[in-house]
């Protein structure tokens, strides 16, 4: 049997041994409820707040801007629902091809009076500079002292206020990295709540919350070798956010429930490890990804690399083999010992085409034949060569 090669690190990563040790230690020694006032509770609270401070420092935030959640999906839902229920309804502006955690949350708000408007992207999946101008007909430079940005309603010609905007920082399917500052700047100037989905970015590229200028930012530990079941939302100090869960005062009343101390400590440990080695890790991931990409294009020169090859995560390769079926490729690669995916694991089982590729204008023969390979630090160059050989063999067989 061929040895397995795991190339699905954007779906999840294996926790580092040091992270597992940290979680195990605090499960045993920091087991008390951090809300309790006795010595054991105070000790657990100390660990929780120390983890919060470490995470805040690494991500360019203040400790009281960190809200612990169960992961990135909950964090984005908390931001979007919390913002929507804290203000008068209007329009939510979102980039085409957002993660399901964002898209479905936004869609669920439509029955409550919210409308959606798409920010267009170019053929590489990057936000179009003129897209903001097309969404806001008056154009960013002519907004003057308007209280809100406005768009045309889906139902009539009356302008509707854009009150929330959301953008994905690094795309989970293509790895494309957005330049978000133009959007966050105009949102900040006109009082629009701006959320960033940074789940794929944190732990792969440098993320500084204050410098990005957003209102909120979501992240999840299992994407950067931390434990599953923990993530966070960075929320700008002073922002009103309505909770959508009830029953406790934890996380400043925004996320009730007994805090997961051991998991928070594990997440902080994973981020600390990334911080110490971030430059070496970025170089290593790029080397692995580029080796695999070169091997595949050498064997399949007609293949199409999706997204920007300049502005993308160092570990991500989304590639199409036009004329073939992505599902067939995926199944056959699994039989060949290659673990990869078609795109977002949160959308697995959906018959719909990858929204990110459709938004980029990819034709059906491309988006139906696309596969995502995401390398990790545990991979080797020898594995990349082996994987390219196996993948090339599968593609040749499927082409007949």
Walk through the language-model features, giving the residues of each.
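Pyridoxal 5′-phosphate
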Residues: 1-400
């Amino acid at each position: 049997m061929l040895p397995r090669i795991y190339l699905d690190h954007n779906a999840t990563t294996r926790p580092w041994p040091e992270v597992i040790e940290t979680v195990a230690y605090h499960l045993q020694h920091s087991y008390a409820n951090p809300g309790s006032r006795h010595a054991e509770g105070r000790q657990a609270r100390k660990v929780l707040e120390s983890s919060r401070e470490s995470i805040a420092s690494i991500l360019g935030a203040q400790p009281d801007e960190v809200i612990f959640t169960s992961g990135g999906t909950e964090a984005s839902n908390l931001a979007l629902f919390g913002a929507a229920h804290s203000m008068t309804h209007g329009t939510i502006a979102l980039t085409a091809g957002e993660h399901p955690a964002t898209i479905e949350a936004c869609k669920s708000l439509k029955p409550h009076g919210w409308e959606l408007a798409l920010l267009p992207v170019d053929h590489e999946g990057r936000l179009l500079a003129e897209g903001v101008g097309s969404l806001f007909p008056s154009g960013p430079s002519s907004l003057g002292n308007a209280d809100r940005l406005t768009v045309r309603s889906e139902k009539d010609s009356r302008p509707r206020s854009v009150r929330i905007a959301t953008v994905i920082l690094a795309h989970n399917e293509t790895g494309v990295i957005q330049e978000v500052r133009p959007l966050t700047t105009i949102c900040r100037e006109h009082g629009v709540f701006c959320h960033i989905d940074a789940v794929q970015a944190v732990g792969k590229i440098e993320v500084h919350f204050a410098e990005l200028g957003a209102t909120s930012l979501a992240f999840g530990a299992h994407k950067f070798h931390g434990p599953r079941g923990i993530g966070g939302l960075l929320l700008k100090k002073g922002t009103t956010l309505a909770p959508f869960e009830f029953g406790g005062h934890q996380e400043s009343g925004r996320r009730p429930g007994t805090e997961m101390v051991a998991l928070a400590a594990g997440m902080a440990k994973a981020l600390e490890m990334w911080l110490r080695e971030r430059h070496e890790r970025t170089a290593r991931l790029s080397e692995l990804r580029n080796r695999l990409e070169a091997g595949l294009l050498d064997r399949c020169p007609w293949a199409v690399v999706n997204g920007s090859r300049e502005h993308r995560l160092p570990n991500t390769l989304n590639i199409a083999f036009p004329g073939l079926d992505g599902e067939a490729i995926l199944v056959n690669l699994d039989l060949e010992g290659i673990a990869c995916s078609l795109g977002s694991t949160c959308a697995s089982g959906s018959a719909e085409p990858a929204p990110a590729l459709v938004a980029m204008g990819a034709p059906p023969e491309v988006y139906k034949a696309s596969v995502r390979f995401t390398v990790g630090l545990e991979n080797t160059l020898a594995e990349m060569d082996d994987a390219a050989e196996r993948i090339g063999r599968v593609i040749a067989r499927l082409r007949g």
